[in-house]
Amino acid sequence: MEKSSYTPNVFIFTRYYLPGFRAGGPIRSISNLVYHLERYIDFHIVTSDRDMGLSRHYNEVCLDTWIRNSENEVIYLSRLFFGFNLLSLILRNRKKSKVLYFNSFWDPMFTILPLIISKIFLNNCKVIIAPRGEFLDGALGVKRLKKNFYLWFFRSLGFVNNVVWHTTSYDECDAIRKLFKIDSNSIFQISNFSRIADKDIMKKGFLSGDTLRIVFLSRISPKKNLAFALSIISRLEFPTIFNIYGVIDDVEYWNYCQKLISQMNNHVIVIYHGSVDNRFVLDIFSDNDVFFLPTKSENFGHAIVESLLAGTPVLLSDKTPWRNLSSFGVGWDLPLNSDEVFLSTLNSYYSDLINGVSISRYNISQWINNRINHQYLINDYIMLFSQN
């Protein structure tokens, strides 16, 4: 199937997009989706003029005008007169806007405002919302009062009956059903696309001498649970390097993590590398022996997939969609209420590596590639974006 006169025009509203990278998963969700589907669907991406947490806009892009990029186009809206520019954009594209896709539920600028404008000025357009894990228990409890008000507002304006939901996990499907008291007909559960790893990555070995290299690559916030990882690593009795990558979301939390880092034994080295461009993520994972992410809540986990694509095992909490990993030989998913299980798992893994137990990056990468069948995903997404 290629583009035709029936090809849907899909307007994607997302606060962060390429060339940004600091927001992590949400950017990769959309950029991978566009990459795999641009032969079949006309995408028009509406995004902000800067990366997450930065006060300056991108220098390398023109603002407030459509920029053609391969088979799709992007507009970076400046903060000055944002509301006016957004209204003008929607009105100018009324005839073209057949499908609207929102890459968040709570975003005031790139979901709530355009959703209200579209309800007033657009007729017969399909509205799709991708909450990206925002309804899971660990995420819904943050800023609960403000979120409850918007949920009331959302229901009062009758949006519930006119929205299609896109989720990537059964847990979020279930959360949406319970929260809005709807059936499954308006919910599409479709996994995210992944990238393809370079074959040279598969040739990298494990361990650096007798040192275990552990990596944490995620936003630094209580939800991602870096402090828990540090508390486990502080108890390891063998040479360890713990590489931390990610944007600091919560400065107070990071200060607490730094206190934990300062108390590490001499044989444990902790290095904070800052945020990382998505282009280098697979290489970073392949340079480490295990990805440690004891997250309190995860909807999909792009970093988890990318670690597996690089052939690096993952040590996760049981709060992600990726379960029973040890039975496939690609990692572990463990309960957060048991520090000892995490500690013993790292000890056993290190012992296996030291004793020469064979671990194949290629086999790990093949496992995740088999789990994510891109052609099936393409067909599912075409159905999601169809105008019927």
Segment roles from a protein language model:
Residues 313-317:
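Short hydrophobic beta-strand element within catalytic cores of glycosyltransferases
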Residues 16-18, 36-81:
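N-terminal strand-loop element at the rim of the active site
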Residues 147-166:
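Membrane-proximal helix-turn-helix segments that form the acceptor-binding/catalytic region
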Residues 354-388:
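A charged, aromatic-enriched C-terminal amphipathic alpha-helix characteristic of glycosyltransferases
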Residues 275-276, 283-288:
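Short alpha-helical donor nucleotide-sugar binding micro-motif in glycosyltransferases
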Residues 28-32, 212, 216-235, 252-255:
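A conserved mid-protein helix/loop that constitutes part of the nucleotide-sugar donor-binding site
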Residues 296:
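Aromatic "clamp/platform" in nucleotide-sugar-dependent glycosyltransferases that forms part
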Residues 49-52, 217, 241-258, 272-274:
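Glycosyltransferase donor-sugar binding loop
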